[in-house]
Amino acid sequence: MSWWWARSLGAQKEFKENGALTSYQSVGLIIGVTGIVGNSLAEILPLPDTPGGPWKVYGVARRPRPAWNTDHPIEYIQCDVASTEDTLAKLSPLTNITHIFYVAWTGSEDCEVNETMFHNVLKAVIPNAPNLRHICIQTGIKHYTGPLDPDGGIQPHDSPFTEDLPRLNAPNFYHNLEDILIEEAAKKKGLTWSVHRPALVFGFSPYSMMNIIGALSVYAVICKHENKPLIYHGAPDNSRDSWNVYADAADADLIAEHQIWAAVDSNAKNEVFNCSNGDVFKWKQMWKILAEQFEVELVGYEDGQKRMSLQERMKGKGPVWDEIVRKHKLLPTKLEDVAQWWFADIVSQSQNLVNGVNKSKENGFLGFRDSKKSFVYWIKKMRAAKIIP
């Protein structure tokens, strides 16, 4: 059974500390280690059976290391990669890096800032790491849909999305990152690259700007605390469609495994790949699971019912969340960190966003996830980390 197949079936190994290794087969640098996929990479890369290993892992993030990330056996580096000076000072000394996993963004659509961040990392690492072999970057399905603003006037591609679809005529920092990656990799002999375009990500990170499971879980927790039903917010003009439409997602661990595959498998070099769990679901199924997990009454889509966005419904709930944190002795967090209402509202307006993943299969990646099980898994992860009760 392959490593990827075993992990898809839940047969992954736990990390066990067996003393410090004196040599490593690979050295990974994760940029954005406290993000939703960076956190998964930090957990999976150091495992004893991870392909390409044993791995030494550096993890880079702008903020101090959070408590929920400290159990990963990595070397944490606090560095603002938007600052050229800070990036050169912190990353240039890392001369043993063999692989870069770039899973960072600014939290805005600003092409220039995101381009600068990526350039800074490459300028610090490539000239100083003679054994650098591969660079992974993560983008996403905005490559096929255009900007997050659903009223932006950009006509998205029809789904299922395939990697050979042309770029849309709209500013998108994904394009900038891809162009920089290909150009810079071509300058160094033997340096390969891969681009990963995941679907909606199911994962865990209180610092992620696009954490759908985090937002929905916090919403359910607040509903339970206030003894109110869990009301599907939907969208004013397409609630029925968003409730019933087929959707897909990509488990954060699966995305990490996908990037590790591309980093070590010759069939994946210098290619672009979509990534998703390999199944589809309807949001009405996920909301039922959400209500069951938090033991709250579900009010789903109903004809004629007035819709209210989560941003509106959760306005002013910061003190309520503070009370919940105190009551259940959770890790101290602010509501705006753990719940991104704007993103949950955008997801509820999304329709027919399905990633085709045949290219990954044809090149040898057979990993998958059951999306319903993945949804529950990440809720349990958040509970175990004391982010939610």
From Swiss-Prot:
GO MF: oxidoreductase activity, acting on the CH-CH group of donors
Keyword annotations from UniProtKB, A to Z: NADP, Oxidoreductase
Substrates-to-products reaction catalysed: (S)-8-oxocitronellyl enol + NADP(+) = (6E)-8-oxogeranial + NADPH + H(+); (S)-8-oxocitronellyl enol + NAD(+) = (6E)-8-oxogeranial + NADH + H(+)
Family matches, as SUPFAM superfamilies: NAD(P)-binding Rossmann-fold domains (SSF51735)
GO terms, biological process: monoterpene biosynthetic process
Keyword Glycoprotein set for record: no
Transferase found in the keyword field: no
Active site: residue positions: 142, 174
Pfam family, one: PRISE
Binding site residues for substrate: 142, 174, 350
Enzyme Commission no: 1.3.1.122
Binding site for NADP(+): 34-36, 62-63, 80-81, 104-105, 138, 174, 201, 208-210
Similarity annotation: Belongs to the short-chain dehydrogenases/reductases (SDR) family. Highly divergent.
Function field: Iridoid synthase that catalyzes the first step in generation of the iridoid ring scaffold using the linear monoterpene (6E)-8-oxogeranial as substrate. Iridoids comprise a large family of distinctive bicyclic monoterpenes that possess a wide range of pharmacological activities, including anticancer, anti-inflammatory, antifungal and antibacterial activities.
Protein name stated in the entry: (S)-8-oxocitronellyl enol synthase CYC1
Gene behind the chain: CYC1
